[in-house]
Structure formats: C-alpha cells, structure tokens
C-alpha cells in the first residue's frame, strides 16, 4: 500500500525540541530504500538531470466493494495527496538512486484507485534526460 509522507512530529526532551518522522512514514521510507537498493544492485547513483515517473495504486475502501459488478480502476481524488506520496518516494530513493534530490527536474505522476481485484502498488522509474540546449527559441 502506498504511504504518504506525514507531517513531522515534535517532542521535548530536557528542554530541547526534537523533530522526527511518524512511524508510518519512517517505515515507508525504509521500504522504498530497500526496494531501491535491490533494484540498483551495485549500480552507481544517477547524476544528471532526472525524470521521475511514478504511479500509485491505492486500495479501494471496503465500503465501495461490489459483488455483482466489480469496480474498475479510476483516478483517486481523495487522500493521500499525490505530492506527499512523491515526497516519501524521493526521500527513500535519496542517496541510493541519486545523490541529491535537486537532480530531479521533471516529474510525471498519477494516483489511481485500484480495481476491485487488484493489489495496491507503487511503480517508480528514473530516467536521465538530456540537458536543455543553449540555443534560444
């Protein structure tokens, strides 16, 4: 199940305020990092300008499941926000797929609600793209 980056939490220990990730976000980042390390298997991190392509399949709420006419895929216009899903993926891939998230210069993403018989998923790919030419249009 895709996980969105949660708001930071704060705690006070001995007069010092400490910010930390919620457990769900922390575990989601670890899962993304593990999958990224497995996919990269000894490859060096990408350096140039990158195009991030992502697709998130969110599970259908149980209240919408139908027995006679199963529901098909559709765009998900409810929570979680697409930008928060992307933040978690970018944070999890940092240092593994690329060294600096500033190298991601283009993003193509969509968030859908899975069909009734489909498992939730996250698909991510990174592609190095050509730098813009110096010629002005």
Language-model region placement:
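Acidic, proline/glycine-enriched N-terminal capping motif
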Residues: 1-137
């Amino acid at each position: 199940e895709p996980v969105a980056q949660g708001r930071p939490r704060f705690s006070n220990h001995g007069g010092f305020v400490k910010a930390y990730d919620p457990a769900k976000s922390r575990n989601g980042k670890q899962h993304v990092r593990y999958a990224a390390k497995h996919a990269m298997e000894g490859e060096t991190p990408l350096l140039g300008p990158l195009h991030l392509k992502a697709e998130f399949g969110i599970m259908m709420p149980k209240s919408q499941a139908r027995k006679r006419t199963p529901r098909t895929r559709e765009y998900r216009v409810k929570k979680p926000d697409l930008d928060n899903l992307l933040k978690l993926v970018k944070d999890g891939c940092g240092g593994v797929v690329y060294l600096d998230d500033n190298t991601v210069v283009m993003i193509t993403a969509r968030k859908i609600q899975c069909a009734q018989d489909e498992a939730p998923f996250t698909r991510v790919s990174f592609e190095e793209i050509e730098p813009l030419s110096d010629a002005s249009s």
